[in-house]
Amino acid sequence: MLRKVGDLTRVPPTGHPPCTLQPGARLNRMSQKVAVLGTGKIGEALLSGMIRAGWAPADLLVTARRPERADELRSRYGVTPVTNPEAAKTADTLILTVKPQDMGTLLDELAPHVPADRLVISGAAGIPTSFFEERLATGTPVVRVMTNTPALVDEAMSVISAGTHATADHLAHTEEIFGAVGKTLRVPESQQDACTALSGSGPAYFFYLVEAMTDAGILLGLPRDKAHDLIVQSAIGAATMLRDSGEHPVKLRENVTSPAGTTINAIRELENHGVRAALIAALEAARDRSRALASGKKD
């Protein structure tokens, strides 16, 4: 089931201590401090989306490797830069958005400072919740999230899975956070690698197709800017029809495929060149790479 969390009004708390969440207790956003550790493009998109959705900047903590980056985030959003250990000690929820290859080092730094009642949310591709549970205090709730770059425009698809100690309320809290930048979907963790292949990497496939179709437009005699505009608007329209009509994509394709027409001739060439099989193979390769990341392989 897809979930889109709407804007909510938030009254900022004043000087609360970190909350202690008992098993089954209800998470309350109005008594939460959230820290984003790793403020690259996705981390910053999540930060800005949360503020637009009603989180008070005073309750948002950030970490950054470079002091100038920390100052930039403070100036732009009014958030509080802290060190990684300070974030672990102060925040109720830790969102880890560093690269997968950097996660082990980050956890080594955090582990001595993370109490077992902190919610830890990982946004790293391919790393299972067990990786965190083995390195953090026993009983620490961990939620795994795979989001994608459309978070930059509040159109992300974020796939959420619970670790061993994460409750329904932890999942709901995670959905509220990532719902600020798009839609969320709960899946068993065993499906995360497949979801990474489809939606985590998915935007890149569409960009690749737009690039190829733009080149085709140039070959057919169109200026690059006009070819680009034609393709992008067609993509937006097609995606909107898929989302809003409820029709199967085959039906929508058939509606524009006239007998002996231009579309069926184009589809024939796509089939002759194995485009469908290539897409399936590409997604299998992405799935396999996600699995390899989980096993610690770098190449």
Show where each model-derived region lies:
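NAD(P)+-binding Rossmann beta1-loop-alpha1 motif at the extreme N-terminus of oxidoreductases
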Residues: 16, 20-85, 89, 155-156, ...
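NAD(P)-dependent Rossmann-like dehydrogenase/reductase catalytic/cofactor-binding core
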Residues: 28, 232-299
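Rossmann-like NAD(P)(H) cofactor-binding subdomain of soluble oxidoreductases
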Residues: 46-47, 67-68, 76-77, 81-160, ...
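Short acidic capping loops at alpha-helix termini that bridge into adjacent secondary structure
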Residues: 57-60, 116-118, 141, 225
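Small-residue helix-packing motif on alpha-helices
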Residues: 60, 70, 88, 103, ...
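Internal alpha-helical scaffold of NAD(P)-dependent oxidoreductase catalytic cores
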Residues: 131-141, 157-195, 207-244, 289
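Short pre-catalytic strand/loop immediately N-terminal to key active-site residues, enriched for Gly-Thr
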Residues: 142-143, 192-197, 249-254
